[in-house]
Amino acid sequence: MNHNMEMTEKTTGSGAARWGFYLMGLLILAMGLTLNTKAGLGVSPIISLSYAASVIWNRNFGDMTFVLYGIFVLIQAAIHLREKGKAGRSLLMKDALQFPLSIVFTRFLNVFSVCIPSLEECGTAASGLLGRLGVLMLALIFTGIGAAMSLSMRLVPNPGDGLVQVLADTFGIGTGLMKNCVDAFCIVLSLIMGLLFAGKPVGIGIGTVCAVMLVGRVIALFHHIFGKTMLQAAGLESGRN
């Protein structure tokens, strides 16, 4: 009896830790993406579409990101509709859960966007090139850590990551290669939007290139240093050797 109670308490504690790491990861990721936009040097490829739309049409960045994520979820659902039986229903349920995740995540973006000033306009020492590069590096570190934490918990994926995984599975190619393809598509479409509606690129710059090159490295380094300990704390990996 006591053994069963201990097991239940351990499972409950692990579940709470798992959700705690997941939500903390989403917060850190939202902070990283927001800092990325505030540095004014180019944003991450996957959100370049929503950022360009928010600037060109003077819309809320978080709301535009929610629309973008909604499109990503609908694409995943359309692909999963071909699946039959219990597996198909399970995949569609996982897709549907990305909608409430998107609402919460984009509200985080809005809160951080209000609290953090744009460095291009604030007129402080941080608005110089060195200051903006420093904020960009901090943004990429936060983005990598947040993505690593939330993805490692294996709960509801961020719609961007979910789309990459679904497309990789559908076309039978590696996730890394598909991520590069999706990033390239987003960058090209953002450039076209900017040139057509603003007469110049919007949201694409050195920060975009740095995000492509460095965020994956940050994720790998975080997993190497903290991954095993975090997974054990979340109950996803045994502490035994």
What are these regions (language model features)?
Residues 2-241:
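Extended, low-hydrophobicity, polar/charged segments
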